[in-house]
């Protein structure tokens, strides 16, 4: 089942990639600092990420960890 979170995070990751950045690095920076500057404004990604549940986002990024 596709959730609202799944839809939003996909849109955010696509915007980050389209802006020329690597999604994991940017999302990791955002969750570790809380600074929204890590998220591009492209396609409203910065506003969209603010609507996501913080714990759900943190779990998602932890699962993405390439290490």
PLM regions and their residue ranges:
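Intrinsically disordered, low-complexity, basic-enriched segments
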Residues: 1-67
């Amino acid at each position: 089942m596709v959730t609202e979170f799944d839809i939003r995070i996909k849109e955010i990751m696509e915007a980050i990639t389209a802006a020329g950045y690597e999604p994991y690095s940017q999302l990791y920076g955002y969750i570790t600092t809380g600074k929204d500057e890590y998220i591009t404004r492209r396609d409203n990604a910065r506003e969209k990420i603010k609507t996501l549940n913080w714990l759900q986002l943190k779990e998602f990024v932890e699962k993405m960890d390439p290490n």
